[in-house]
Amino acid sequence: MSIKPIEYRDGVVRMIDQRLLPTQELWLEYRDYQAVAEAILTMVVRGAPAIGVAAAYGAALGARDIEADSFESFLAALKNVCDTLAATRPTAVNLFWALERMQAKARELAALPLDAIKAALMDEAQAIAAQDDAINRAMGRHGAELIADNARVLTHCNAGALATGGYGTALGVIRAAVESGKKISVLADETRPFLQGSRLTAWELHKDGIPVTLICDNMAGALMRQGEIDCVIVGADRIAANGDVANKIGTYSVAVLAKEHGLPFYVAAPLSTIDLKIPDGDHIPIEERDTSEVTHCGPTRLAPEGINVRNPAFDVTPAGLITAIITERGVVRGDYVRGLANLF
């Protein structure tokens, strides 16, 4: 059974600290929005859908603590809360989607007493979390039809239960295929520099009893050439209107390799990851993270001091390299501009 990385209980938001996995399973408690923002920024929680769920809970915690004498002042304070949460990570559009949904819910309830609005916002955050799990399962059912029995599936980064409200996007498709009776084995790229593949994907799949083999990022091409991979499936942090996909750094390289070797390259993502306001991948903001993630592994330095370092957290895979985009409302192929727009 897949883990849920975010919980709400008795006024407290709890998150598993994904930075410590797989060696330590530590749950942290959050009682205010500033702490939730820090958790998103420092990657206690990560993965676009999970970030959206965490942000919704953060907005609800922030709303709970607002002292206001009018709806207008409450809404202004809620916007400040949401602005703080929105400033944490720029690429994952689910973050902004969830925060806008929370503010829209507040505006919808303008006629109610403020205490009732605050309670409704916590209910809305819980609804976002529950709906994300249901969305992932629907996506899994659609995507499972694309995965053949006995398939050897390569995935990059972690698009599993840990990256969502539960079940997973790319790993949700794999889980659904296994649940349908198919024999599936997974190859997980380690995913430098944050090692989400080795620390998180391998941990999740192993915990669920799904066969998984960990590989270094630079092994993928050789294994494709040797016929050891049948298809690739990844998640997404933002999908532009034309089907270009921003995902964890290294995804583009895997897509190029898949194209060269004639392998299907699938992207699994909910509608909340699709940003029709962004025309193409060139307009997606790409987060640059601290260089220490590249120069260090934990406390151990791996590179000389003073060296120049780049650490973009994401890259963009052009739509032309993508075989299909799997969503909770079905699978889109070919004309992504029309196909993605028709989902809404």
Curated annotation (Swiss-Prot):
It catalyses: 5-(methylsulfanyl)-alpha-D-ribose 1-phosphate = 5-(methylsulfanyl)-D-ribulose 1-phosphate. Disulfide bonds: none annotated. Its EC number is 5.3.1.23. One of its GO terms (biological process) is L-methionine salvage from methylthioadenosine. GO terms for molecular function: S-methyl-5-thioribose-1-phosphate isomerase activity. Pathway: Amino-acid biosynthesis; L-methionine biosynthesis via salvage pathway; L-methionine from S-methyl-5-thio-alpha-D-ribose 1-phosphate: step 1/6. Keywords: Amino-acid biosynthesis, Isomerase, Methionine biosynthesis. Substrate binds at residues 46-48, 89, 196, 247-248. Gene3D superfamilies: translation initiation factor eif-2b, domain 1, Translation initiation factor eif-2b, domain 2. The record marks 157 as: Transition state stabilizer. The active site is at 237 (proton donor). It is an enzyme of class 5 (isomerase). Catalyzes the interconversion of methylthioribose-1-phosphate (MTR-1-P) into methylthioribulose-1-phosphate (MTRu-1-P). Belongs to the eIF-2B alpha/beta/delta subunits family. MtnA subfamily. PANTHER family: METHYLTHIORIBOSE-1-PHOSPHATE ISOMERASE (PTHR43475:SF1). This is Methylthioribose-1-phosphate isomerase. It comes from Syntrophotalea carbinolica (strain DSM 2380 / NBRC 103641 / GraBd1). The gene is mtnA.
